[in-house]
Amino acid sequence: MTTLLIATRNAHKVAEIQAILGTGFACRPLLAEFPAAPIAVEDADTFAGNALKKAESLSHWLAASLQAGGSRDGHLTIGATRTFVLADDSGLEVDALGGAPGVHSARFAAMESGRDGNSPDADNNAKLLRLLATVPREKRTARFRCALALVEFFPSGDGQKEPHLFDGACEGWIDFAPRGKGGFGYDPLFIPTGRDQSFAELGEDVKNGISHRAKALAGLREWFGRSGGK
């Protein structure tokens, strides 16, 4: 069993990653289990840059904290299983908006008021619809992108291997109103190419077979199968 410490507090994201990877992996929310962990400033201009920054900084912090005896939670069994820190940075690119919200997807609405932190999904969706109010169907093309950064975790902090990056994209378009109750983020507005339902309507099984995150995780799973994670 390989343990993946997911660099997020987002329970939806952890559950989605676990569902896509299936057996052989135990996914855990690193930031929820270690509340004192620092949140990396996502100031890179690419999804891959942000994912890499989060994975490396959290891996180093966790090793230092465990050595100091400051963050043991009684559940992380070092040595019994190989453990990796996995960071995901993903978002929506809308062509009519020049690729926005892009790396700012989670804090899209908050940026208008200068607030720090992420915005509620409903606020982000409302802003997106407002900006696209006069844009016709044929120009509402968009895609979800996902970048994953994987770093093997060593409690000693020594011998950290080179990180591995994986990416995926899902093409589609932005609907004129939210549809469906499932998913999270921009899922109620995103209609993937070849479908007539939003991600929020398709259900987890269908979404997890075609999404940007599913494609990135397929690369990760294939890498583990080919290399044994080495």
Give the ranges of each region predicted by the language model.
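Anionic-ligand binding patches
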Residues: 2-5, 11-230
